[in-house]
Amino acid sequence: QELFEELQSENFHVVAVAIDENTETVSELAAGTSYPVLMDKDHLLTELYAISNVPSVIWIDENNMIARPAASEVGTDTFTEITGMSRETHMQQVRDWVRKGVLPDDASYSVPDLSEEEVQARLHFRIAAHLRREGREEEAGAHFDRAAELAPLDFTIVRASMPLRGGDPFGEEFFELYQKY
């Protein structure tokens, strides 16, 4: 929010996309933002941009071209003690890009295509989410399990399934996943 407010007069825009099914929780987290926050309950963005971790950012320029591909970045220092990641480096990179047209070195990174296992994992996740919405919890569980087997370190699958299965995406289960990552 702070960076958006700082740079919006320089034609800088933020669009947040929550890769989540819980609109109530996302709405609470989005309270007070003045930029759009969209919901992607079907994880389409993760497939389009090969996103496997959250939070991730994609920089898109005024010509609708990707200036920097998906990168794991944070917008707050809430979890700095856990992740060791500070927001300030990323924030300064954004300022330099907006004001000077300078891109960070990793902007030329080519995001590899999803592997066959990752594609299959995402399909299983989608099936599981659909089955869960239909009230078919047991069948959904089998597909969530298979998705996690195929892509065990994909946060957009493993962590995203936690609240859908009654787990806490910020609890012990998450920290176990984070340690593996």
Annotate each PLM feature:
Residues 118, 150-152:
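Short coil turns that delineate tetratricopeptide repeat
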Residues 164-181:
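Alpha-helical linker/edge segments of TPR/alpha-solenoid repeat scaffolds
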